Amino acid sequence: NTYSYAAAEVIIPHVLGGNLMELLTLQTSWQSVCENTELMVAFGGLPAFNSQISNGGTGAHIQRLGVIEAASAGTKFINLSPRRSDVKSDIDEAWYTLRPNTDVAVMLAMAYQLLTEDLHDDYFLNKYTEGFEKFQAYLLGQRDGVPKTPAWAADISGMVEEDISALTREMAKKRTMLTVSWSLTRQQHGEQPFWAVTALAAM
């Protein structure tokens, strides 16, 4: 497995089917983001300094321009990262700092809130996913006695409870795209952010 996203390579076939390399060829274009995305929530940010790396020669590094164009088209960017610079600084973006390795706690709290406030998409979950009832039980604390509330996640992540709640409600109201930096796989339990964000997006 590659160093860049080894944990994702392992978990993605079990969560989405296929393999990660195939899925990478289907990534969303910046043009599509500009046309369809009202809110982009970036776990780990969108650091331009190491995006679109090339194995050799020169590559077309379009992310910086893509972010600017999307912001100009009305996309609001949310940077969830310890570093503010993980999203281009000259666009209007909101930054919420998280303790390293705590992104999944915030994702779970968002999923909990979508569930308990009836903001989730039952039709999509029933038609296109399997096993949501087990995930639901985990979110509600039926398996371990710990409901995955925004207050629970705030204590772990350092993100303010009210900010988690407000952002979750905003995500439910708008056409939202969730992104996860490959860097989140390079930590203990690095497969979990990709699994959790897939479940959150499905909701």
Regions found by a protein language model. Name each.
Residues 1-36:
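Anionic-ligand anchoring segments at beta-strand to alpha-helix junctions in alpha/beta enzyme folds, i.e.
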Residues 1, 171-203:
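A glycine-rich, hydrophobic/aromatic-adjacent loop/helix-cap motif
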Residues 59-73:
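Catalytic-core regions built around general acid/base machinery
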